[in-house]
């Protein structure tokens, strides 16, 4: 029997200026499943993602592998839930690719030889062998996104959370990154406006608008519903258009 990887129950959240970002969000995800979160700008997608590894905290609203996220276990939760942000510049700040990918393991006090081994194998997994000495700022956006992903995968999380993973990528880089993500055999949660990517990556979909879930179901059913998507400023994936 599969474990329940994520359980969100009645999650509501308002920012300090009283802007309501989430209203009574509930969903669950089994280990190994891939969930897409879609919706127009301002729907609350990114705010929801930030609750899944405790960047934003609301007591009792989120469980990761049946453990309630709280101040007492935030480090443990972040070891289980790896987050890849939309902009690689939010994750890459060291002078070399090796240093960026090694940063997390170094903070966990791993031995230097173990760190080198893990960084090398993670970069190889993503097709980045030989990139260790390169400066991330000199790489293409697609390459920087892969390095950002490597900084998460090197820590071996059980859940990968991705915020707009294909944003601003050219068609070739987008296809390459999607192929990379599909090979990662972990529980994945992806928020995106890119319906083609959601169709490629996700088996289940939640549609959000104005901080609430307005529809949920299989990716096949939700992403074929032209009327539903257009009502929420989204489009049917190109491969599903008649």
Predicted regions: what they are:
Residues 38-40:
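The feature captures the beta-strand-to-loop junction immediately N-terminal to the Walker
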Residues 53:
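Helix-to-loop junction immediately C-terminal to a conserved catalytic motif
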Residues 113-131:
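Conserved ABC ATPase "signature" region
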Residues 135-139, 143:
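Conserved ABC ATPase signature
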Residues 192-193:
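H-loop/switch region of ABC-family ATPase nucleotide-binding domains
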Residues 198-200:
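A short, surface-exposed alpha-helical micro-motif characterized by mixed small hydrophobic
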Residues 212-235:
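Conserved beta-strand-loop-alpha-helix hinge in the C-terminal portion
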């Amino acid at each position: 029997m599969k474990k329940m990887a994520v359980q969100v129950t009645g999650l509501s959240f308002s920012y300090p200026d009283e802007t309501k970002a989430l209203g009574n969000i509930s969903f669950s995800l089994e280990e190994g499943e891939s969930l897409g979160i879609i919706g127009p700008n301002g729907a609350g997608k990114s705010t929801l993602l930030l609750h899944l590894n405790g960047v934003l905290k609301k007591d009792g609203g989120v469980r990761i592998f049946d453990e309630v996220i709280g101040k007492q276990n935030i480090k443990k939760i972040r070891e289980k839930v790896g987050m890849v942000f939309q902009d690689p510049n939010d994750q890459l700040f060291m002078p070399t690719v090796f240093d960026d990918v090694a940063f997390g393991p170094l903070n966990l006090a791993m031995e230097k030889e173990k760190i080198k081994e893990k960084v090398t194998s993670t970069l190889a997994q993503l097709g980045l062998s030989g990139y260790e000495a390169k400066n991330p700022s000199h790489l293409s956006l697609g390459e920087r996104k892969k390095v950002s992903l490597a900084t998460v995968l090197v820590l071996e999380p059980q859940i990968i959370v991705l915020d707009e993973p294909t944003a601003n990528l050219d068609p070739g880089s987008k296809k390459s990154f999607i192929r990379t993500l599909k090979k990662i055999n972990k529980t994945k949660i992806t928020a995106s406006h890119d319906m083609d990517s959601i169709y490629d990556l996700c088996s289940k979909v939640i549609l959000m608008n104005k901080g609430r879930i307005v529809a949920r179901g299989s990716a096949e059913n939700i992403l074929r519903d032209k009327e539903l998507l257009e009502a929420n400023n989204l489009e049917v994936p190109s491969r599903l258009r008649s």
